[in-house]
Every structure is written in C-alpha cells, then in structure tokens.
C-alpha cells in the first residue's frame, strides 16, 4: 500500500466484519450480516469498490458475482493509521504525541513502568 487512505465509519464496519470472518465473502453475505442497516446492493458495492480503490480489499471476479478478501491485515491497517496520525499531527515525533497525550495529567505508576519496559525492549531490538 503506497499511500494511506482513512476509512469512513461504514467502510470500517465492513472491514471489521471481513477481517473477523477471515474468509473471502460475497456482497450477498455482507448484506445479510448488515441487514439491520438496510443497505441496498448498490450501496454495499460502492463501499466495496472504495475499499478496493484504497487497496484494503482484493476482488476476485467470479461468474456468479465478486468475492472480496482483505488485502491487508487489521493489525497492519492500525499500524498505518497510527503512523499517519503521528506523521500528520506530530511530524513523526513519538515524544510529541506522548506529550500531547499526557497533557499535564497524572500517569499511573504501573502504566509508566509498563511503558518504560516497552521502551527498553524496543531499544534492545535496534
């Protein structure tokens, strides 16, 4: 995936289901899962086309309809989204992000210790 494309809320709902199913799906299956949303087939097809255009799903064309499968894992998407946030709002600075997150509030001692251990582990991997 060359460029990061953020998903709309509806696209994210659909992707979560596709990731959770962990098997290729059809429009009909997705419409059944989202029957409470009362989306028409064209609406679902539009969402799936957008997800494909963003490089998030792969489409396999079959005679009885397309089959859709994730092109990236959920974990990879979250990594890309986090990196995009870091780059766009904090110039890629993790320290800037953590400072904004902390914002003068109190940090739980246990959480601070877990973060310290995590940073030590990350440092060892380099």
Where are these predicted regions, by residue range?
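Amphipathic alpha-helical dimerization/coiled-coil segments
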Residues: 80-123
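Short alpha-helical segments that sit at the start of domains
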Residues: 1-17, 125-126
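Glycine-centered, phosphate/nucleic-acid-interacting loop/turn motifs that mediate DNA/RNA or nucleotide
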Residues: 55
């Amino acid at each position: 995936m060359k460029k990061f494309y953020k998903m709309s809320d509806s696209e994210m709902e659909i992707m979560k289901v596709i990731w959770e199913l962990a098997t290729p799906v059809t429009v009909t299956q997705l419409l059944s899962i989202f029957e409470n949303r009362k989306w028409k087939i064209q609406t679902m097809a539009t969402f799936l086309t957008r997800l494909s255009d963003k490089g998030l799903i792969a489409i396999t064309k079959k005679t009885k309809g397309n089959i859709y499968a994730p092109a990236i894992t959920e974990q990879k998407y979250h990594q890309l989204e986090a990196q995009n946030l870091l780059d766009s709002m904090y110039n890629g600075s993790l320290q800037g992000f953590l400072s904004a997150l902390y914002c003068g509030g109190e940090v739980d001692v246990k959480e601070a210790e877990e973060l310290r251990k995590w940073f030590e582990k990350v440092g060892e991997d380099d």
